């Protein structure tokens, strides 16, 4: 077996690969419903949330788009310190949002004080944060950044991309007051791609 040394897709356990060879379960059956609901309940523990966890047929980038399209009408502050946070900013622009950037040098974190200063200058409906910027390997201090938003601009929603961190590091979604958090299956979960997951407390 050839091993992949990438952030994702990552190596999938042979037992999981074998399970994919089994016949599919029709999605309208009681068996599927029981399995799907059971998966959601388990994911709530991973997300550390009491809210619903959605399992949509989309990519992580698709869930970035879902976040900005559904949770902000106009004004978004995008924190940018790498390729994937840059992508989320561009997704917001492409979806007709008035997105402003809070930039940090690639390889550096988004500083809580810088976020506080930006939030004091303008009222934003949402702020986008990539928890672990996959392109550089930098983990942003999400707990501290969320605390800044709650203190300085409590009506601003916190949207988090945790594609390469959820399941690999502790994220206390409810306790930290994160409003929307997304991840994908092909990184820390070590599953096949194309199974994004997200938790929404505001729809």
Predicted regions and their residues:
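A glycine-/small-polar-enriched, mobile loop at the entrance of the PLP active site in fold-type I
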Residues: 2-57, 61
């Amino acid at each position: 077996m050839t091993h992949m040394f990438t952030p994702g897709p990552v190596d999938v356990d042979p037992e999981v690969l074998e399970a994919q060879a089994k016949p599919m379960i029709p999605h309208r059956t009681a068996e599927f419903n029981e399995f799907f609901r059971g998966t959601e309940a388990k994911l709530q523990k991973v997300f550390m949330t009491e809210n619903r966890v959605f399992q949509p047929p989309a990519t992580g980038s698709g869930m970035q788009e879902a976040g900005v399209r559904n949770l902000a009408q106009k004004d978004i502050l995008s924190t940018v310190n790498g390729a994937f946070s840059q992508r989320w900013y561009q997704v917001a622009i492409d979806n007709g949002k008035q997105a402003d950037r809070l930039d940090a040098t690639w390889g550096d974190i988004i500083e809580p004080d810088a976020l506080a200063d930006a939030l004091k200058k303008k009222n934003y409906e949402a702020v986008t944060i990539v928890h672990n910027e996959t392109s550089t390997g930098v983990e942003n201090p999400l707990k501290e950044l969320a605390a800044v938003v709650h203190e300085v601009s409590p009506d601003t929603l916190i949207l988090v991309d945790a594609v390469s961190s959820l399941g690999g590091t502790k994220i206390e979604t409810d306790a930290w007051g994160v409003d929307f958090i997304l991840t994908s299956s092909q990184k820390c979960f070590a599953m096949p791609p194309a199974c994004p997951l997200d938790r929404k407390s505001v729809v």
